């Protein structure tokens, strides 16, 4: 009786996880596009990172702080932990678990944390 409802609940959670992974993947693409187009500008009053977060905040209707966080996690997913990012995009882990892995490996000197 409850199994079908629980199955739908599990699938909804996986869909939410996949959406979070997709959001970070798209933000990562946006980051690459900005850097290819503008690069790091020494003459700008702000750096490219700030410009990207300002654009994201306006587009998504979120604070710049949250946009900054999304960009940092998107960069971690793309550059440092693509395998963990793949788990998030597949819905196998949730966004909080992804954040925890990123945080705990942020300054890790262990080479296994880096892509091959």
Task: Walk through the language-model features, giving the residues of each.
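Peripheral, non-cofactor segments flanking catalytic/redox cores
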Residues: 1-116
């Amino acid at each position: 009786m409850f199994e079908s409802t629980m199955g739908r609940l599990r699938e909804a959670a996986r869909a939410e996880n996949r959406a979070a992974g997709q959001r970070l993947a798209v933000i990562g693409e946006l980051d690459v596009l900005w850097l290819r187009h503008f690069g790091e500008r020494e003459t700008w009053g702000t750096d490219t990172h700030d410009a990207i977060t300002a654009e994201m905040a306006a587009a998504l209707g979120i604070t710049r702080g949250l946009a900054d966080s999304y960009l940092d996690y998107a960069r971690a997913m793309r550059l440092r932990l693509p395998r963990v990012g793949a788990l998030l995009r597949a819905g196998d882990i949730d966004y909080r678990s992804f954040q925890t892995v990123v945080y705990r490996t942020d300054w890790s000197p262990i080479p296994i944390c880096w892509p091959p």
